Amino acid sequence: MLTLLTHGGGDGFYSYSMFCTKAALLLQMSGEDWQRQDVHDPAELARMPHTKLPVVRDDTGTLIPDSEGIRRFLEDRGAEFDAGLSAVQKGQSRALIRMVDESLWLQLMCARWLEDDGWAGMLQTVFSGVPKEPVNEFRAKVLDGLHFTGHSRFDRAERLKRLEQDLTAIESILGDQRFLFGGQMTAADCSTAPMIEALSRAPAAPQAVEVTQRHGKLLAYVSRVMEQGALTLPQAA
């Protein structure tokens, strides 16, 4: 049996890490027998490849890190996440996943870590009960990273404008389809739905939530993806 090592969840989130939720959806789609194991100990997290989650542990104890690494691992075992897609659609899917995982993710990081309202929500949820000093030190490192990417150097209005542009682009791709590339879930849905869900409610800052909530078609889409995934999706203890 495969084991997904993941950050915990709560408040309706399978995990507060959207990449962990992505990995869980990929595991569900793969048909593999798997289980969830939450990682709470910082020392255990430090021993993970890349010192981050998600990570899958296989029956031999081998650790497979990163949501895209997990996808490749599952594909090597026979999983087919983009069945029925043309070569062009597969290229579009790959580009969309990169936009979500790298552009929308930066929006989410700013909405949770940079904005004071978002950070207050993080302290009440993700870091509830954790001593403030190490958490604040960790936040400072995250903010340094966001500054290095350049994203946090934009003012709020510019960030929100870019968020609106990205969400509008995804909404255009979705159209009137059930999922992004038709009537069946594909790999792109596993990335996109959890990220939009995270931007649509706390602990994301209210300004980002407001922009995301204006896209009702995307919110309905997120519900479809999560409902399909949740048929047997493990829940946080």
What is the predicted role of each segment?
Residues 78, 174-177, 229:
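A general structural signal marking secondary-structure boundaries and capping sites
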Residues 37-43, 185, 235-237:
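Acidic carboxylate-rich catalytic motifs and surrounding loops in phosphoryl-/glycosyl-chemistry enzymes
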Residues 105-219:
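GST-like fold's C-terminal all-alpha helical module
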Residues 223-237:
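Alpha-helical oligomerization segments
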Residues 16, 83, 180-183, 208, ...:
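Short, hydrophobic secondary-structure boundary micro-motifs
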Residues 22, 26-29, 162-173, 224:
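Amphipathic alpha-helical segments that form well-ordered structural scaffolds
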Residues 1-132:
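GST-like domain detector, emphasizing the conserved glutathione-binding G-site
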Residues 71, 75, 94-97, 101, ...:
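Non-transmembrane alpha-helical segments in soluble domains
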